[in-house]
Amino acid sequence: YEIMPSLVGSEMCIRDSIMTELAQMFELQQSATFFGSWGGLALALLGAGLAAVLSGIGSAKGTGMAGEAGAGLLCQDPGKFGKVMILQVIPGTQGLYGLVVWFFAIFRMGLLSGSLPELTIAQGFQYLAACLPMALGGLFSAIAQGRVAAGSINILAKKPDDWSKGMVLCITVEFYAILSLLASMLMIINISA
């Protein structure tokens, strides 16, 4: 009877050892997958890229709309080029803000150090979420600002002395792009390393 308890204990020890080995192999296999190894970095880069790309798309569309309206006016009155140019450039600031968020995010990730950082999935999602305000805010505010700038060019065409009122209207939309920039920057600053 005394030998049996020791055999049962040995079997339990072997079983625990096998289970531990299997668990370690599973963890190793899971960490070797793309998402396990690089998922956090991939999510973070996706967020940073979206901030730059979507803001840039919005700025391109916004400045394009304002440029189309400005081209019509400049055919009739080339002397208004300076004022038209100012109104056309205003929707382009969101692209710049998106690039600032992209640069700040990759700086905080540690990508500028020369080596690839190891970010957890949670950190990757934090970067993605932090970059979304600028990505979406930049996209939609730049398009809206382009429409306002195009309308302001119509003000310049009909009442040249009142063109500054159109600038004030454009700056009102700019305020929300600045809020998007601020939200993204504050969120990125608070991501733990």
Model-derived regions: residue spans:
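Single conserved hydrophobic/aromatic residue that forms the stacking wall/gate
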Residues: Y1-D16
